[in-house]
Design a protein with these regions (language model features):
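Helix-loop-helix junctions that connect adjacent transmembrane segments
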Residues: 1-2, 40, 44, 117-129, ...
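Membrane-interface "cap" regions at the ends of multi-pass membrane proteins
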Residues: 1-28, 32-33, 37-40, 50-58, ...
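Hydrophobic transmembrane alpha-helices that form the core helical bundles
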Residues: 31, 42, 51-138, 142-146, ...
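Transmembrane helix-loop boundary segments of multi-pass membrane transporters
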Residues: 31-35, 39-40, 114-127, 150-160, ...
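TM-loop-TM module centered on a large, flexible mid-protein loop between adjacent transmembrane helices
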Residues: 72-75, 80, 112-117, 203, ...
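Helix-loop-helix connectors at the membrane interface of multi-pass transporters/channels
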Residues: 76, 103-132, 166, 223-227, ...
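Membrane-interface loop-to-helix entry segments
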Residues: 110, 129-180, 234-238, 363-369, ...
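A generic transmembrane alpha-helix motif of multi-pass inner-membrane proteins
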Residues: 384-460
Length: 460
């Protein structure tokens, strides 16, 4: 496949990967921890931080247009092969586990239409019927992407537009129903009994996750029609997502008082729609949630398959995963990715285990490459503007790692350790097997040793 992804397709890929299931629960999530004043401050800080990260990606695509797949290649080029591999491995692993959760959420949302007190068909998305349905959806998307990334991206563009319809309807109705006295009631959150700055921190513990996927266009940059579109698509998608999040959370506080909104069950947007337009509102949001998550799942499947392909081309993953089919789709890495997702689905059903801890740890691994984006720009920047953006992106990246929980970052060595063994095997599969550097050997040794106590802490 030739480089055919235009600005619209790239923007949709990024926006769709960010707008998943979370936006439909944001009203309650935010109202539970923060007042309108804290929300305005929290979104302001988050907005500046994510825009700095998006600008860092934009500048890197202009300064180093030769580097495809950003998240992996920026880390490799700036900080060595081992750091590059860990960035790719952590990103891919997070994408796999996130895709499992998307499939579970889809069928949990479908239970709104199929389940009743007498019949539990899909339940919370972990019944055997839900797992069978999720498996069918998994392999339908698999063969869709095998037809070519351009085909999948075109469908994703349509899905992104479709998911914006219920969100747009919600915003319009919320503007009409907005009542300023309701919004300003207890504006600083006295009833919460928490200082405003503590409320701000609590909002940012939520907002740090809603922009995961911002790197989508950079990951598939090798397939862009024009490299300049990559950075612009990232910036446009961030601005669009930030606008949606701001409108959804702030307008909701003018429809219902914060204490009442905080008690709603999720997806809270459905309850608000019922209040504004009757029982059909819940149906619209449930359908919108399903379309939204399916679109996000398609985006993440494309991105998850692209990373092993690029890593194999740079000799960080086994040579096998550099294979592409006649349509230039990353066939080998797609099989690896979706086979891993399928195994996880079966394990969830068979064990009935809660994988939320694993999802949290893996999600933290995706934040490390965000910091490395800023660090790489700082390393190669010459102009004062570029350096200033790089410093800001680094600070925001460090904040993300701190706010999401340093302990989870430490526990992530449990997932990095098998990756290191995979890295050592991968090097043997390539003709040019370059010897490890001394410091790389030390880091590998430390990771393997640290994995033992980390595993004990995780299972105890």
């Amino acid at each position: 496949m030739e480089k055919k992804l235009g600005l619209a397709a790239l923007t949709a890929l990024v926006l769709s990967s960010m707008l998943g299931a979370g936006v439909f629960s944001l009203p309650q999530n935010m109202a539970e921890v923060a007042s309108p004043a804290a929300l305005l401050i929290g979104w302001g800080i988050t907005g500046v931080g994510i825009l700095l990260l998006a600008l860092a990606m934009l500048f890197l695509t202009r300064l180093r247009p030769d580097l495809d797949g950003g998240i992996f290649t920026y880390a490799r080029e700036g900080f060595g092969e081992l750091v590059g591999f860990c960035s790719a491995w952590g990103y891919w692993l997070c994408a796999v586990i996130a895709n499992v959760s998307y499939l579970v959420i889809v069928f949990s949302a479908l239970s709104f239409f199929t389940d009743s007190p007498e019949l539990r068909l899909f339940g919370d998305g972990n019944t055997w019927q839900a797992i069978v349905g999720a498996s069918v959806l998994l392999w339908v998307v698999h063969f869709l992407v095998l037809r070519g990334v351009q085909t999948a991206a075109s469908i994703n563009l349509a899905a992104t537009l479709a998911k914006l319809v219920p969100l747009g309807l919600f915003v319009v109705l919320a503007v009409i129903a907005f009542h300023m006295p309701t919004f300003t009631l207890d504006f600083t959150g006295v009833d919460l009994g928490v200082p405003v700055w503590e409320q701000v921190k609590n909002t940012m513990l939520i907002t740090l996750w809603v922009f995961i996927g911002v790197e989508g266009a950079v990951v598939v940059s090798a397939r862009a029609r024009n490299k300049k579109d990559v950075g612009m698509a990232t910036l446009l998608a961030v601005l669009a997502a930030l606008t949606v999040y701001l409108l959804v959370t702030l307008l909701s506080l003018g429809v219902l008082a914060r204490p009442e909104l905080a008690q709603m069950r999720n997806p809270s947007m459905a309850g608000l729609m019922v209040k504004m337009m009757g029982s059909w509102g819940e149906v619209i949001i449930a359908a919108g949630l399903i379309v939204s998550v399916c679109g996000a799942y398609l985006s993440w499947t494309i991105m998850a398959a692209e990373v092993p392909l690029l890593a194999a081309q740079y000799k960080a993953f086994p040579r096998l995963f550099a294979r592409q089919n006649a349509r230039n789709a990353p066939s080998a890495s797609l099989w690896l990715t979706n086979a891993s997702v399928q195994i996880c689905l079966v394990l969830i059903w068979a064990t009935g285990s809660n994988y939320n801890t694993l999802l949290t740890i893996a999600s933290e691994m995706i934040l490390v490459p965000y910091f490395l984006v800023g660090a790489f720009l700082l390393k190669i920047a010459h102009r004062p503007l570029h350096k200033a953006i790089a410093v800001g992106a680094c600070i925001y990246g460090l904040w993300l790692l701190y706010a999401s929980g340093p302990m989870h970052l430490l526990l992530s060595v449990v997932l990095y350790a098998p990756g290191v063994l995979f890295f050592l095997y991968a090097r043997r599969t390539h003709v040019e097997n370059v010897a490890l550097k001394g410091q790389e050997k030390i880091v590998i040794g430390l990771l393997l040793v640290a994995a033992l106590p980390a595993t004990w802490m995780l299972v105890r």
